[in-house]
Design a protein with these regions (language model features):
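Short, non-helical or kinked segments that cap or interrupt transmembrane helices
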Residues: 29-48, 85-98, 184, 208, ...
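Cytosolic-side transmembrane-helix boundaries in multi-pass membrane proteins
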Residues: 172, 190, 197, 201-204, ...
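Hydrophobic alpha-helical segments embedded in the membrane of multi-pass proteins
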Residues: 18-27, 43-50, 71-79, 189, ...
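Helix-loop-helix "hairpin" substructures at the membrane interface of multi-pass membrane proteins
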Residues: 153-232, 255-256, 260
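Extracellular/periplasmic helix-loop junction at the C-terminal end of a transmembrane helix
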Residues: 103-149, 272-282, 308-317
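Alpha-helical transmembrane segments within multi-pass membrane transporters and channels
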Residues: 60-107, 269
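Membrane-interfacial amphipathic/re-entrant helices at transmembrane-helix boundaries
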Residues: 1-24, 37, 51, 58-64
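Transmembrane alpha-helical segments in multi-pass inner-membrane proteins
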Residues: 227-296
Length: 324
């Protein structure tokens, strides 16, 4: 029973770790399906994390924090769009530039406003954080060994943003494959000239895609600083935006396979946390440096085997111009 409990707790940790990855990966899916490379996922998440924590600490309301996080990420997304859609700049450079800018700007503003070394105040007041939602009969269900513990630990006790991320996958699949907007969005990423010939604005669709990406990155960043943690710290995204991009590529720009990739990466991250300081048979205690690198090593190995077979949208990374 103790082993089973540890497995359930590991799966619960996997869900919590997968949430920001999934939100960012679906955000990148909308953007890249429209033909815009989204290397700014990391920066948008980081900017949203700072804004959400700062506003939540200042106002005492996590909902104001969520709004600030989304607004910040959307602003950064539009900034990237202005550079690479309107002015047809290099999409990789635009995304990386925003990420580098936010990585320095967030701690600088935090130091100027709060004087806490680039951090925000701890979010320990009522209403400043997203807390777990206990579902009906969760406490009673713990007495039932298998389904009850799964219900009590996996389904119950998660915060609202986790449930939103879970609903996002079928929602994104429906939008992309069952709506006119999704059809046009995918067409822009494959053949923008055909879309333009049909009288549809290519740039307009791409801007809508990057705005959706900004909204979802805003939710992901807000989750990091107001749900997974109790405030903002420097570099708190820790490469999650790039892991989300890797999961998106591994999932071949499709919602359900991308969910599987996010869960796999999150499981290795959660497992790495559990393995720290634990003596394993034959090898003994694994060095903590190797354990921390495990999710990224797995990412490289998986992409080395699958990226060649993953077909990206044909027009991705290509600025559109009617003259060409």
């Amino acid at each position: 029973m103790e082993t089973y409990t540890l497995i359930v707790l590991l799966l619960a940790a996997t869900i919590r770790v997968a949430t920001p990855l999934l939100l960012a990966a679906i955000a990148g899916m909308f953007s890249e399906r429209a033909g815009v490379i989204d290397l700014g996922l990391e920066g948008k998440m980081l900017g949203a994390a700072f804004a959400a924590a700062a506003v939540s600490a200042s106002t005492g309301s996590v909902w104001f924090g969520l709004g600030a996080g989304i607004a910040t990420a959307v602003f950064l997304a539009v900034l990237i769009g202005f550079a690479c859609i309107t002015h047809r700049g290099n999409q990789v450079v635009a995304g990386m530039a925003v990420t580098i800018m936010v990585a320095g700007l967030g701690p600088t503003l935090g130091l100027a406003w709060f004087g806490l070394g680039g951090q925000t105040p701890q979010l320990d007041g009522a209403g400043q954080r997203f807390t777990g939602i206990v579902l009906p009969w969760a406490r009673e269900a713990r007495e039932t060994p298998v389904p009850g513990l799964l219900y009590a630990e996996l389904l119950s006790g998660q915060n609202l943003l986790v449930y939103f991320a879970a609903a996002l996958v079928p929602g994104a699949a429906w939008v992309l494959y069952r709506t006119r907007f999704g059809l046009r969005l995918r067409a822009v990423g494959e053949n923008p000239h055909a879309v333009d010939t049909a009288g549809i604005s290519v740039n307009g669709l791409r801007y809508r895609a990057v705005i959706i990406s900004g909204v979802l990155c805003g939710v992901a960043g807000t989750y990091l600083s107001t749900a997974a943690s109790a405030g903002f710290v420097r570099d708190m995204t820790a490469g999650k935006g790039y892991l989300a991009l890797a999961a998106l590529i591994f999932g071949k720009w499709k919602p359900w396979p991308t969910l599987g990739a996010c869960l796999l990466f999150a499981f290795t991250d959660a497992l790495a946390t559990r393995l720290q300081g634990v003596a394993l048979p034959v090898v003994g205690v694994v060095p903590v440096q190797f354990i921390l690198a495990l999710p990224y090593v797995l990412t490289v190995l998986l992409l080395a085997g699958f990226v060649g077979r993953a077909e990206a949208p044909r027009a991705i990374g290509s600025p559109y111009s009617k003259e060409k």
